Structure formats: C-alpha cells, structure tokens
Regions:
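Short, flexible surface segments
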Residues: 98, 357-358
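C-terminal-of-GTPase-core extension/linker across diverse P-loop GTPases
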Residues: 1-10, 15, 21, 148-355, ...
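Conserved Switch II/interswitch segment of TRAFAC-class P-loop GTPases
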Residues: 44-49, 76-86, 97-158, 173-186, ...
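Conserved G1/Walker A P-loop phosphate-binding module
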Residues: 1-115, 143-144, 149
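Amphipathic alpha-helical transducer elements in NTP-driven molecular machines
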Residues: 36, 50-53, 66-72, 86-100, ...
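Short capping/connector residues at structural and topological boundaries
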Residues: 36, 41-44, 51-53, 58-65, ...
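Glycine-rich, flexible loop/turn motifs
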Residues: 27-35, 42-44, 52-55, 84, ...
Length: 368
C-alpha cells in the first residue's frame, strides 16, 4: 500500500461525484452537468482529522502539526459498456487499478433539474451497472491469466496446477456478477491473484448522496435504506453524505464550518465520515511521533510490527531498529507529560516483535 492511502471515487455521470470531489479537495475540477467532463483523474490530498495531534503539540511544544494524509482520485465518468471501451472506458479502468479502495457515489436524491443518465433514480440499478462493468473487466484479466497458466500447467508446474482451479472458481463467480471480495477467498488465494490487481477484490464503500434538506434526518429516504441493505449483504461499507452541503462546508473556515455543522445538528462533516470509513475499510491506524520540531501522525495497517512502522519514517530506522520507546496516547494525556508518564512506569521499551497499536506515541531507537 502506498504511503498515502488512495481512494478512487467512482460513479455514473450526474450522481454528484464531482461535486463531492471538489468539496473534498477544494480542487475546483470541472463539475458541469455534463457526462465525461473529468477526463484525467483529478487527485486531491486531504488531511486525516485527528484531535490527538493538537494535544501532543501542546504537550511537547511542537512548532508544527503534520496530520496523516489521504489521497482521493476522481475517476472519470463510468457508463454502461466501460469494460468494452464505451465512454472513457479504458482510461477509467487503468486509473482505478492503482487505488487502494473504491468509493462509489450513489445518487439517492430527486432533482428534476439534474438529469440522470438512465432517466430515473434507482440506486441499486446504478450500483449493479458499475459492479457489472468492474466484474467484466476482471473477467477479462482472469481469463487471460488462465490461458497463460494452462500452458505452464501442461509442463507439470506445481504452482500453476494449484492456481488453475482457483482461477476457474473466480471466473464462475465473476460470470454471475459476484465481486471477488464476496467470493470467500482465503489469504493464500488472495496472495496468488495479487498481481492481477483485480478491481472487485478491492475494499469497497458506498457513498449515498442525499439532498441538503435531508442531511439532518434521512430516515425517510427509501433509496438510502436500499443501499444500506445492499451494502450489508455484500459486506461493504456505507457513508451517507450530501455533496451539496460538503461543497458549502468547503468554502468555510474551521470555526465557521463547526458552527454550520452545529446548526444542522451534525457532529462531523461527510468528509470526516468518509475518511473514517475508509480507514476502517482498509484496517488502518495512526501512531504518533512528537517533539519540539513537530507532532506527526503516521498511518499503518493494523497488525504492523514496530520495525516496519519505523520504516514508514525512514528505511534506515527500520534497518537499524533497536527498540521502540512507547506510551499510549491515553496514558500520556492522563499523566500530562512524558516525564510524569515515565515516573509512573507507563513508558515502555518494546522489541522487534511488538505489534503497534492505534495512538502509540513512539520514539524509535536505532543504529545506522
């Protein structure tokens, strides 16, 4: 996984995808009511909100705060037939292969002024159009691979022989429009097909885009209920946002947006919900380093051991890793300072097998 987590935003034309993307990144990509206006994938980098950083900066007298970052890629309008090169099909597929997760914006609002490419509002149909295109693209990749592996298997290659039945199983599932992530593959099987970068194997999230009138209470929105049910059956995540509201928030200062959210009765913005859901989807956590220069968050996959976490900062620290000096953020905050935490015996030295936890405040000892 890349240093910055990368989420690809996809959706049919006119579902609010570019409006949401512009709000996310304030990048001002062209969000016209016009299919295919986003030809090159626009990339926007956003800070991952984490209130713990300000506490650490205050405690350590840090000159600056560096939050973790997340990259959102606006992937040009997908339409029916993209896997066969319709619309911007081939470009779409090459761009989406590079992302860590896919967020699919689904239109769950009625607005006669914004035409839907299929002429009516039906979120499940929209999801299935996109999923079918992704399944068809994967089917092509797996069938090509199968042809190659069959030749190798004939020469008696053991690995190729083991892989063939797996490929056949995946082909059968994709033919029934079943995403790879819903086919129950185990770790070993996923490793076997990793280099194929299959689109339907990527973690997926549905972003239900509702009207601004419903943002405080969308319990009566039948479209959202259907998407929630669909996501649950597929084991995918779901976030409900109003792209219009997000674009209004994007124009405001931090203080203004906090007041605006409070007026709407919301605890956090749709963007914050989207980032948190993406973190959960990819099993990510943050650890911290803090000192006079900076208080900084580093993103790692849950289950990462200390030396590999150190490698996020610099490969030399991973190579020369001796120990990690660690205190949990909660303990540190309760004690009020690093010294007080040390006196209470809450700062511990951990070796190379230590599995990092979310909120670990860390100082790595290493030798180059």
């Amino acid at each position: 996984m890349s240093t910055n987590l990368e989420v690809g935003i996809v959706g049919l034309p006119n579902v609010g995808k570019s409006t949401l993307f512009n709000a996310i990144t304030k990048a001002g990509a062209e969000a016209a009511n016009y299919p295919f206006c986003t030809i090159e994938p626009n990339v926007g980098v956003v800070d991952v909100p984490d209130s713990r950083l300000a506490v650490l900066a205050e405690m350590f007298g840090s000159k600056r705060i560096l939050p973790a970052a997340m990259r959102f890629v606006d992937i040009a309008g997908l339409v029916e037939g993209a896997s066969k090169g319709e619309g911007l099909g081939n470009k779409f597929l090459s761009h989406i292969r590079q992302v860590d997760a896919i967020a699919q914006v689904i239109r769950c609002f009625d607005d006669p002024n914004i035409t839907h490419v299929a002429g009516s509002i039906d979120p499940i149909r929209d999801i299935e159009i996109i999923n079918t295109e992704l399944c068809l693209a994967d089917l092509e990749s797996v069938e090509k691979r199968k042809q190659r592996i069959e030749k190798i298997a004939k020469s008696g290659d053991k690995d190729a022989r083991a892989e063939l039945p797996l490929l056949e199983r995946i082909i059968k599932g994709l033919g029934e429009a079943k995403p790879v992530r819903a086919q129950g593959l185990d770790e070993e099987e996923l490793e076997m097909i990793k280099e194929l970068t299959l689109l339907t194997a990527k973690p997926s999230l549905y972003v239900a885009n509702i009207s601004e009138d419903e943002v405080s209470d969308y319990s009566a929105n039948e479209h959202v209920k259907r998407v929630e049910e669909y996501a649950k059956n597929e084991g995918a995540g779901i976030v409900v946002v109003s792209a219009r509201i997000e674009s209004e928030i994007a124009e405001l200062s931090d203080e203004e947006s906090a007041a605006f959210l409070e007026d709407l009765g919301l605890e956090e913005s749709g963007l914050t919900k989207l980032i948190k859901a993406s973190y959960a989807l990819l099993g990510l956590i943050n650890y911290f380093t803090a000192g006079e220069m900076e208080a900084r968050a580093w993103t790692i996959v849950n289950g990462t051991k200390a030396p590999q976490a150190a490698g996020k900062i610099h490969s030399d620290i991973e190579k020369g890793f001796i120990r990690a000096e660690i205190v949990s953020f909660d303990d540190l905050q309760a004690c009020g300072s690093q010294n007080a935490a040390k006196e209470k015996g809450l700062v511990r030295l951990e070796g190379k097998d230590y599995v990092m936890k979310d909120g670990d405040v860390t100082h790595f000892r290493f030798n180059v």
